[in-house]
Amino acid sequence: MNNTIRELLKKHAGLPVSVDGLDDGADLYAAGLSSFASVQLMLALEENFDIEFPDSLLNRKSFQSIEAIARTVASIVDDRKVA
């Protein structure tokens, strides 16, 4: 999943640094992720993983790092399986 997230970051985040050079725990906002880019990334994640982000997860913490995004996506997928 992290590799997919990296590819989506490359396409949609417009970071001024190389996504490949970022650790999974690196702060994406410190690396240059804007609020606009985070929305574009969210839309790409929703399309790619066939999910919908609930309002409760639309916050900076959910998109802080590749690890955080992976946890957030996994929790949405897990919740969908339970429902």
What is the predicted function of each stretch?
Residues M1-L33, A37-M42, E47-A83:
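Phosphopantetheine-dependent thiolation modules in NRPS/PKS and related acyl-activating systems
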